[in-house]
Amino acid sequence: MSVISANPWLMLLAIFVINVAYVTCLTVRTILTLKGYRYVAAAVSFIEVLIYIIGLGLVMANLDKFQNIIAYALGFSVGIIVGMKIEEKLALGYSVVNVTTANYELDLPTQLRNLGYGVTHFPAYGRDGERLVMQILTPRRFELKLMDTIKQIDEKAFVIAYEARTLHGGFWVKGVRSKKLKAYDTDEI
């Protein structure tokens, strides 16, 4: 640590990097906790606290330099963004995608089932007449692929996606057909 303390630029860099690492862990741990991954969250929190103690120690030992506090705050901000990007890549959990279409001829439910998605569909009535409504549950990592697939098949479909909090019964209890979902390319539709 004496090498870092002797060089003010190294000190700034160390404080910044340590705080980015700390807040990244903090953000990921919070998201893991909210999604119910409590044991993984506990392991991440152990690493988080170790990093926090080191970073805070560096700042507290050098409070007389305002730039160190700025580096700490910037590291905090960047850490939030990095943590959120990591969570996006992990894509934990499931999404419910609701699709409303007026085009019955496309037989969208059958096409999506053939691609491995579980689809529940039913008739509905909107301002402009009869519609077909579909409810599709998909792992979050396939949400964008599903949205692209729907746009390829029916570009006028009305689509809403939201996070599913609790699952019980139905298609997903039998097992996700992830291999089938991964196997197709949206350009081939």
Swiss-Prot record:
Question: Cross-referenced Pfam families, in alphabetical order?
Answer: DUF2179, DUF5698
Q: Which UniProt keywords apply?
A: Cell membrane, Membrane, Transmembrane, Transmembrane helix
- Residue spans crossing the bilayer: 8-28, 40-60, 66-86
Entry membrane topology: Multi-pass membrane protein
Q: Which InterPro entries match?
A: DUF2179 (IPR019264), DUF5698 (IPR044035), UPF0316 (IPR022930)
Localisation per UniProt entry:
Cell membrane
Any one GO cellular component localisation term in the record: plasma membrane
So what family is this one in? Answer: Belongs to the UPF0316 family.
Record protein name field: UPF0316 protein Sca_1484
Organism lineage reads as: Bacteria, Bacillati, Bacillota, Bacilli, Bacillales
